[in-house]
């Protein structure tokens, strides 16, 4: 198979972990006889500094013409600390999602047995937890009508039937591939938009008789995720709720540096780590590259290259078992490996496998 990959390294630690993802992908392609070409493009604060736009038209062209995007992270404190800034790095991420029609964000939440001690929750609660959070990406308050003056502000949480149906379809289809349990998360006791979500989910559920479908208010879901994370198989929800719940779910694993994600929809899919740009660690060779590397595994699996994805996951598991880890997940007294060293170890494992 031939792959054409757009690489958007972004800001902060993005360029460092991006390199590791690319090297892992190249090693896997070489091993399995695939051809891969990379085209690099700018985004986020880097793009604002260079051209004044966090997602320039040239970057959009590169993404649109690729088979997939390997994205890293955007964000810079100089924008976070300036409430008057008209252009922000994160707007580039929103623009990419909107222009590429990426309406579904898929985030796996799972624990690694050798790292359960890193979770803030008790080991017996989190060991074996394995579920998907599916978040709608292009509707709701983040994209609705907005207004702000000195005395009043509002954001509009609007959803249409087609937007809800297509993301629920993704949820049901993933549930069919897994343990056949779908939880629809809403706030139907208060919000009209949530009542429409629940109504449509109830209409669609009979089309998937093998799937057990339940409904949960978002506040209850937030508690359940901590109290009983193994309850969930596939969770689907709207944009704002999903943004919060997926970050909460990342805590279960013990490190945001372990979890990848995929954003899919009408055009080129995007694969990325769930963590941010961590600018304080830029250039220090301490960032965990595993989420970026596992994003590459998700990329291969998206294109039905299951053996390739499985090899990457096996290599990551082996690195953890061998205590080849960056500082935030290393055992006490263990050797602290850098970003480059972890990536190189995994590449070497893949080549020798």
From Swiss-Prot:
Q: What class of enzyme is it?
A: oxidoreductase
Its pathway, per UniProt, is: Amino-acid biosynthesis; L-leucine biosynthesis; L-leucine from 3-methyl-2-oxobutanoate: step 3/4
Q: Which Gene3D superfamilies match?
A: Isopropylmalate Dehydrogenase
Task: Quote the PROSITE patterns the UniProt record gives.
Answer: IDH_IMDH
GO biological process entries: L-leucine biosynthetic process
Query: Which cysteines are cross-linked by disulfides?
Result: none
Site annotated as Important for catalysis: where? 142, 187
Catalytically driven reaction(s): (2R,3S)-3-isopropylmalate + NAD(+) = 4-methyl-2-oxopentanoate + CO2 + NADH
Name the needed cofactors: Mg(2+); Mn(2+)
**Record-listed E.C. numbers:** 1.1.1.85
- Oligomeric state and partners? Homodimer.
Record's family?
Belongs to the isocitrate and isopropylmalate dehydrogenases family. LeuB type 1 subfamily.
Q: What does this protein do?
A: Catalyzes the oxidation of 3-carboxy-2-hydroxy-4-methylpentanoate (3-isopropylmalate) to 3-carboxy-4-methyl-2-oxopentanoate. The product decarboxylates to 4-methyl-2 oxopentanoate.
The name on file for this protein is 3-isopropylmalate dehydrogenase
* Species assigned in the record: Bacteroides fragilis (strain YCH46)
**Species lineage:** Bacteria, Pseudomonadati, Bacteroidota, Bacteroidia, Bacteroidales
